[in-house]
C-alpha cells in the first residue's frame, strides 16, 4: 500500500510525464494503487498522489477498477453541474466544484492499447478530477478565492503534516 501525498507536497503541483513503459512494474504499481484507493475508501487515485509523477490514475465508480494511462479529454460537453468533491490529498475537506456532465476521452490500458469512450455524470466527474491531478491542478484551484480563504487554516494544518 502507498502513503497518500497531501496538500503541500510538491509532487502534487507538477505536470506528470507520459508513461512510456507498459510492463510488469506498471501493472504492480497499478494493483498497489487500487489497493490503496480501496483502503482509503476512494473512487479515484492519481499517480502523483502516491509520489509518482507519471500520467496515470485508477478509478472505480461502481463497475470495478479501471487503469487510465496517458489520458486525453477529446471533447467536453458545455453543459455542467456543480457537486461536492473530496480528495484523498485533502483529508476532511469537501468543496463544491463545477464540471462538465459529459466528456469524450481516450487513454491507454495496461497493455498500451487505446480505449476511447464517452463518460457521463459521476464517471465524468471522477475522470476530470483525476485528470486534473496529472496536470498539477488541485480541487482548491477550482474554487473561489473567498472559499479558499475560508479553508486556509485547514489547508495549513494539512500542509504541516508533509514530510520534507
From Swiss-Prot:
Source taxon at top rank: Bacteria
Cofactor(s) annotated in UniProt: Fe(2+)
Biological processes annotated in GO: co-translational protein modification; translation
Catalytic residues of the enzyme: 130
CDD domains per the UniProt record, alphabetical: Pep_deformylase (cd00487)
Swiss-Prot/TrEMBL catalytic activity: N-terminal N-formyl-L-methionyl-[peptide] + H2O = N-terminal L-methionyl-[peptide] + formate
EC number(s) given by UniProt: 3.5.1.88
The entry's keywords: Hydrolase, Iron, Metal-binding, Protein biosynthesis
Cofactor mode of binding and number, as noted: Binds 1 Fe(2+) ion.
Record-level Gene Ontology MF annotations: metal ion binding; peptide deformylase activity
Binding site for Fe cation: 87, 129, 133
Entry-linked InterPro entries: Peptide_deformylase, Peptide_deformylase_sf
Alphabetical list of HAMAP family matching this protein: Pep_deformylase
Family: Belongs to the polypeptide deformylase family.
Function statement: Removes the formyl group from the N-terminal Met of newly synthesized proteins. Requires at least a dipeptide for an efficient rate of reaction. N-terminal L-methionine is a prerequisite for activity but the enzyme has broad specificity at other positions.
Protein name: Peptide deformylase
Species in which this protein is naturally found: Thermotoga petrophila (strain ATCC BAA-488 / DSM 13995 / JCM 10881 / RKU-1)
Amino acid at each position: 500500500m502507498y502513503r497518500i501525498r497531501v496538500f503541500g507536497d510538491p509532487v502534487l503541483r507538477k505536470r506528470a510525464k507520459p508513461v512510456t513503459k507498459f510492463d510488469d512494474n506498471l501493472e504492480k504499481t497499478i494493483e498497489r494503487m487500487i489497493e490503496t484507493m480501496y483502503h482509503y475508501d476512494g473512487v479515484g487515485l492519481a499517480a502523483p498522489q502516491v509520489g509518482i509523477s507519471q500520467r496515470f490514475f485508477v478509478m472505480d465508480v461502481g463497475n470495478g477498477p479501471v487503469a487510465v494511462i496517458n489520458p486525453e479529454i477529446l471533447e467536453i460537453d458545455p453543459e455542467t453541474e456543480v457537486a461536492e468533491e473530496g480528495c484523498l490529498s485533502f483529508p476532511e475537506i469537501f468543496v463544491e466544484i463545477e464540471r462538465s456532465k459529459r466528456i469524450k476521452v481516450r487513454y491507454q490500458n495496461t497493455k498500451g492499447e487505446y480505449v476511447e469512450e464517452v463518460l457521463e455524470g459521476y464517471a465524468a466527474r471522477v475522470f476530470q478530477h483525476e485528470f486534473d491531478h496529472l496536470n498539477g491542478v488541485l480541487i482548491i484551484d477550482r474554487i473561489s478565492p473567498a472559499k479558499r480563504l475560508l479553508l486556509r487554516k485547514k489547508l495549513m494544518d494539512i500542509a504541516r503534516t508533509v514530510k520534507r
